[in-house]
């Protein structure tokens, strides 16, 4: 499975901060907690390709989330529920993570895998996402693992050819269907969203009559879980055609 996508260049980053203690015990405890977080962040080494590894154009981070169906979720509780798995900067580092992860088809309940560029959280409200949107495809059960792998390999290999527009991808496992989506920065750029749609059709080998949804994150924030004005109704769950003699 090596060399399934072309490596380009790496992009690493780090952050740091400093804090001071206050005189009161209560404020001191708060500052200590914040200081510990910042010290941990500053000590975290930037993720870079190893010797002889094939660097990616961007660093990416895997995330995982799971929640109880039917329970209302605020943006704060949603953020707390997202768990970061790890960040990688090369083809080899990706496979080290991916080869040990459960495949989407084997997940149970209301679970999601997210793969986003480093520094972008898989949330509508993130600065990189707030003016963007996502293409959505609903799948019959049993197809998520293959489609997810094809999607993220295409994303890591820069097959969408839209510059920095791609933010990340999500696979959502539900009880009666699975959903994959790819997020971009600028929902108003129709040429870019159309190119993403066409590339998505190609890398997933979708039938020509497959109906896809595009939903802006602004619409998602206003009406979570509902059909919005810029969302196209997806009437038939896609399944591959079988060539039967």
Curated annotation (Swiss-Prot):
* Consequence of substituting residue 183 to F: Unable to bind capped mRNA
Compartmental location? Cytoplasm; Cytoplasm, P-body
PTM comment: Ubiquitinated by ARIH1. The consequences of ubiquitination are however unclear: according to a report, EIF4E2 ubiquitination leads to promote EIF4E2 cap-binding and protein translation arrest. According to another report ubiquitination leads to its subsequent degradation.
Protein name, per record: Eukaryotic translation initiation factor 4E type 2
| Superkingdom field | Eukaryota
Q: Biological process GO terms, please?
A: miRNA-mediated gene silencing by inhibition of translation; negative regulation of translation; negative regulation of translational initiation; negative regulation of type I interferon-mediated signaling pathway; rescue of stalled ribosome; translational initiation
Gene name, per UniProt, is EIF4E2
Q: Which InterPro entries match?
A: TIF_eIF4e-like, TIF_eIF_4E, TIF_eIF_4E_CS
Glycyl lysine isopeptide (Lys-Gly) (interchain with G-Cter in ISG15) cross-link: located at 134, 222
List residues binding mRNA: 78-79, 110, 124-125, 174-179, 222-224
**Mutating residue 124 to A: what's the consequence?**
Ability to bind capped mRNA reduced to less than 10% of wild-type
How does the annotation summarize its subunit structure?
Answer: Interacts with EIF4EBP1, EIF4EBP2 and EIF4EBP3. Does not interact with eIF4G (EIF4G1, EIF4G2 or EIF4G3). Component of the 4EHP-GYF2 complex, at least composed of EIF4E2, GIGYF2 and ZNF598. Interacts with GIGYF2 (via the 4EHP-binding motif); the interaction is direct. Interacts with EIF4ENIF1/4E-T (via YXXXXLphi motif); increasing affinity for the 7-methylguanosine-containing mRNA cap.
Region Disordered: what ranges?
1-52
User: Does the record bear Transmembrane in its keywords?
Assistant: no
Give the similarity note. Answer: Belongs to the eukaryotic initiation factor 4E family.
- One of the record's GO cellular component terms: P-body
Start-end of Basic and acidic residues biased regions: 1-38
Main localization of the protein described in the UniProt heading? cytoplasm
Q: What is the effect of changing residue 222 to R?
A: Does not affect ubiquitination by ARIH1
Tell me the residues on which N6-acetyllysine occurs. Answer: 134
Q: What would be one Pfam family of this protein?
A: IF4E
Q: Which residues carry this modification: Phosphoserine?
A: 13
Q: Where is this region: EIF4EBP1/2/3 binding?
A: 54-57, 95-99, 150-157
């Amino acid at each position: 499975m090596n060399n399934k996508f072309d490596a380009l260049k790496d992009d690493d980053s780090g952050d740091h901060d400093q804090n001071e203690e206050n005189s009161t015990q209560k404020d001191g405890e708060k500052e200590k907690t914040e200081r510990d977080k910042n010290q941990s962040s500053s000590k975290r080494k930037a993720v870079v390709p190893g010797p002889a590894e094939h660097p990616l154009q961007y660093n990416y981070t895997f995330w995982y989330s799971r929640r109880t169906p039917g329970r209302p979720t605020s943006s704060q509780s949603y953020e707390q529920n997202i768990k970061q798995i790890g960040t990688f900067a090369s083809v080899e580092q990706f496979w080290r993570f991916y080869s040990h992860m459960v495949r989407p088809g084997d997940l149970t309940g209301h679970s999601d895998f997210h793969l986003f560029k480093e520094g972008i959280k898989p949330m509508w409200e993130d600065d990189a996402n707030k003016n963007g949107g996502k293409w959505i495809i609903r799948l019959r059960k049993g197809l998520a693992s293959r489609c997810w792998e094809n999607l993220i390999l295409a994303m890591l290999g820069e097959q969408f050819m839209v510059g920095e527009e791609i933010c990340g991808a999500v696979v959502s496992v539900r009880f009666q269907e699975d959903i994959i989506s790819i997020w971009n920065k600028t929902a108003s750029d129709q040429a870019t969203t159309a190119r993403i749609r066409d590339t998505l059709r190609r890398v997933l080998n979708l039938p020509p009559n497959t109906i896809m949804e595009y939903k802006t994150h602004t619409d998602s924030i206003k009406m979570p879980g509902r059909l919005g004005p810029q969302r196209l109704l997806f009437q038939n769950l896609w399944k591959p055609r079988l060539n039967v003699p």
